[in-house]
Amino acid sequence: MSFFNFRKIFKLGSEKKKKQYEHVKRDLNPEEFWEIIGELGDGAFGKVYKAQNKETNVLAAAKVIDTKSEEELEDYMVEIDILASCDHPNIVKLLDAFYYENNLWILIEFCAGGAVDAVMLELERPLTESQIQVVCKQTLEALNYLHDNKIIHRDLKAGNILFTLDGDIKLADFGVSAKNTRTIQRRDSFIGTPYWMAPEVVMCETSKDRPYDYKADVWSLGITLIEMAEIEPPHHELNPMRVLLKIAKSEPPTLAQPSKWSSNFKDFLRKCLEKNVDARWTTSQLLQHPFVTVDSNKPVRELIAEAKAEVTEEVEDGKEEDEEEEAENALPIPANKRASSDLSIASSEEDKLSQNACILESVSERTEQSTSEDKFSNKILNEKPTTDGPEKAVDEHASDVNLETGAELNDQTVGIHENGREKKRPKLENLPDTQDQQTVDVNSVSEENENNRVTLETNTDCLKPEEDRNKENQETLESKLIQSEEINDTHIQTMDLVSQETGEKEADFQAVDNEVGLTKEETQEKLGKDGTAQKVITSDRSSEVGTDEALDDTQKAAELSKAAQSGEGDEALAPTQTLAEKPTEGPEAGGAEEEPPGGERVEDKQPEQQPAVCEAEGQLTSTSETTRATLEQPETDEVEQVSESNSIEELERLVVTGAEARALGSEGEAAATEVDLERKENAQKVPVKAESQAPAASQPSEPHPVLIPSININSETTENKEEMGALPKPETILPPEPEHEKGNDTDSGTGSTVENSSGDLNLSISSFLSKAKDSGSVSLQETRRQKKTLKKTRKFIVDGVEVSVTTSKIVTDSDSKTEELRFLRRQELRELRLLQKEEQRAQQQLNGKLQQQREQIFRRFEQEMLSKKRQYDQEIENLEKQQKQTIERLEQEHTNRLRDEAKRIKGEQEKELSKFQNVLKNRKKEVMNEVEKAPRELRRELTKRRKEELAQSQHAQEQEFVQKQQQELDGSLKKIIQQQKAELANIERECLNNKQQLMRAREAAIWELEERHLQEKHQLLKQQLKDQYFMQRHQLLKRHEKETEQMQRYNQRLIEELKNRQTQERARLPKIQRSEAKTRMAMFKKSLRINSTATPDQDREKIKQFAAQEEKRQKNERMAQHQKHESQMRDLQLQCEANVRELHQLQNEKCHLLVEHETQKLKELDEEHSQELKEWREKLRPRKKTLEEEFARKLQEQEVFFKMTGESECLNPSAQSRISKFYPIPTLHSTGS
């Protein structure tokens, strides 16, 4: 056995040699150099730890990735190489990299400020424009550096932009980045996070025809800017498939509220978000834009200081009485986005203005008006609807908004925010035992968004006598009037809340003049259920004049409510309500509000709803600015003149009508709402118009603060509890923001709470929630019962000045649900990221395999061509060698034959010459004999003369004879030479013909080979294209399976949540009914005592009848609840099925689109092949013609050559032949005479 076989058996030396990487240290334990001091997070490919160098104490973020093979290790080398090669102040630096025990450690620079999206989540608000400018400029500089170094980031988003404590940013996460080798190189990988993908990247999912370049990062930058301005990226409420379609087909996204932002910002976004790649600006061009001409990073330093500030948390539990009251007064509060509380605190007015310049352009600074849940309440008293239709319209609307917020009832105080102007009005409350006084820190500015209540040094003073409260109310009024006038002088602008998708105005907050002192009252008549006239007084009083009158009104109201509290009654309705509101601009004066969901004005379409807006300039109110209680009364102009008996009769009527109306939708209707006094105060100066337009979807990430009433119930005063109990189901005219959200029924709505990298595959939560309209009351009551108030106080130092910011937030179960949803979406995004990584690896492997196939086939083509040419060249060479040998042999034979023939002829001629010489000798003898016969004396002279004559004649004869022999010899030799030349010509011609035939065969074989190579290359490219599309289909199906799985999980979560909510509602309903029955019975008995005209037996009979009616009503309520639950479950299941169908439809469209692209590409490939073959054949004809012409020319040259040779030798026939020169005929001198 050989040694090599021995090695094969024992696998000696067969292990693949480990590849060494420049920046990765192998077989070194990183924990010997770095100490893990904490965990930072859990990324898509592994955990991220906080590490510290044991020698230098440098901090680093250590990403630990489990890699099972060398191939997986190579996937991360691009990221490591990019990090190692980049040296820029705005790009994180690679500190170290190890590969140890199948774990890849990547240690990068630690940024203590955290990611931008994490900071927004921590502060629960978006960035200001000045902060966005700083982040944008530094990000642009980093991108410009990357693009100059041929690097495409491909995953730019707020989560990959990190803050340092110095106020700078660093770009991170190059896990999916691409490092090109050429400047103009393009990419066609479908990779990145869907919400930030450029349109040209999205198109690469199904078509690789139009690859992208560095400008894809510019689009992602524009999306990231919108994300920083609105907390969420555009279309974040959609599932990724819808997002991809939206990006590809719709117009570029814009800001939700353009009026809030500067023109430079909007123009910068237009330059970034240009769908035409050629028209989109580059990073170098964007760096010249005026939006990024900032030098100081102070806004970011302040932001980081606030985010990293010391936080003190305080949790307050709500009291049971409050919770029960709130169960009757559930208020829709938006909770569909990241919580936001625009805080920006400065130490002086100048600091405030400089720090919040961008905010103050569109959002006024908001004074904190926090209210403690268990200390006081603002009651909203509402008349019970007399008909079911209009009531249900509003109820469904309120319930829809309640549900759409996910029951996330962050009970907070929110003021009306104008564009650069805030009206501050005094808070006066009609509570005998409770008063809440709030002071605003002058050195602080609190800006609050939809789900947060910002509190600055809130002091609550409880249980004061009524006289003290009135006095303090007056003082509070005066102090707040001063503040209001100061701010009114500073900020006089206008802000509109606009729905982004439809452009419809939901509410116009219009600034009003600063003049005070005008008092105006308007009376509106409405018909109640029994046809009696009802009047609502809309009063507009100045902040100074109407204070005493309002105090008198509230005292009257308190007296009347006390008189109605005898017996078991838990509730009594305040009989007098004063309305404070300036006339709105429009056809109807008196501040008439409109109801947007149905496009109906409350005064026109809902006569049973006449909310009383309480005046805040002096009243201790028990009603809200958005609701008006209508009391049955005589035809009078003054509400204060209503008698006590009329009030009680009205209460009784409300009890009866309310009982009938509640059977239809008590659980699903929004309960009566308390509105913070700040709303009332602002409403007196700022008329609110809710335009009656069709509800439409709005941008979910709208950061602009809107009007949201807080829900505050006072459990310490019996009077107010009784007042609230007197209303079985008060109604509420919803504020503009819930109306705004009512339109969010579509996928672009605000129904889901997501993080910045939301990857949820489901449709908008609001699309489901809008289906469950009438299910809110009981679940909201349960949520209210469990809520806690969380106060956060942040203390930090900005430029040497310590700043304290306090925020209050209601903590409910929905908060944990939001966190759970965010976690689930983060998991889904990680799954998507891992899937993309696997796809990228598989694509790279396939590309490598296909490239190898192409190289192999081209190498084989070349080898076959060389082999074929070599074969024919060898044959031609052999033919030429054979021809040469034949010619040489023939020439040798010809020479020998010529020599032999010359010898033979020469021998014969020598014999003939000797004979001729003998003849001449004999003649000479004869002449001599004749001379001897002559006389002797003559003989001598005659002999001499005769000899001379004989010699001359014989010499001439001999010369003539020799010449004749030479001619004969030359003729014979020439004949032989001509024969040989003809023979050679024939052989040469035959050889040339054979050679040309070989050359023809060679060319034909080459042409055939070329054609076969073209066919094989086409088949290979076609098969490779099919393999690529098969891979794409496979990857697309895997993505679709993952999306379907996520959709099913989401649908299951919705069903489980609905089941839980319905279970809670079923459990709560008996308790609510018992409490309600008790209250209604007490009110009924009280009304009997007041109108005691019957005997006790008759009263007892009436009470029995009333109890029977109550039992029947409760049974109807239970039945209605059961039917509603079944309807909700059915609607939800239908919605889930519709969601799945829609998802499958989108998936099928993508698969169909991919198949169409494949068919189109195959068709194009066939057309290209046909064209190439056609062009090759067209080029083949001239090649054949040229070859034949070359062959004819060579034949002609050969013929001319042989012809010229023959002629040249025959030009001088008398000349001695070349051959005869070699074989000379013997002359006379060679023969002896």
Curated annotation (Swiss-Prot):
Entry's family note: Belongs to the protein kinase superfamily. STE Ser/Thr protein kinase family. STE20 subfamily.
Name of the protein this chain belongs to: STE20-like serine/threonine-protein kinase
Post-translational modifications reported in the UniProt record: Proteolytically cleaved by caspase-3.
Phosphoserine sites (modified residues): 14, 189, 340-341, 344, 347-348, 354, 372, 543, 561, 566, 643, 647, 666, 775, 777, 816
Keywords for this protein: Apoptosis, ATP-binding, Coiled coil, Cytoplasm, Kinase, Nucleotide-binding, Phosphoprotein, Serine/threonine-protein kinase, Transferase
Pfam family for this entry, one: Pkinase
Disulphide-bridged cysteine pairs: none
Keyword Transcription regulation: no
Chain ranges of the Protein kinase domain: 34-292
The reaction(s) this protein catalyses: L-seryl-[protein] + ATP = O-phospho-L-seryl-[protein] + ADP + H(+); L-threonyl-[protein] + ATP = O-phospho-L-threonyl-[protein] + ADP + H(+)
Chain ranges of the UVR domain: 873-908
GO CC list: cell leading edge; cytoplasm; perinuclear region of cytoplasm
Record has Phosphoprotein as a keyword: yes
InterPro entries: Kinase-like_dom_sf, PKK, Prot_kinase_dom, Protein_kinase_ATP_BS, Ser/Thr_kinase_AS, STE20_Ser/Thr_Kinases, UVR_dom
Protein location: Cytoplasm
Native organism: Mus musculus (Mouse)
Compositional bias ranges of the Acidic residues kind: 312-328
SMART domains: S_TKc (SM00220)
A GO BP entry: cytoplasmic microtubule organization
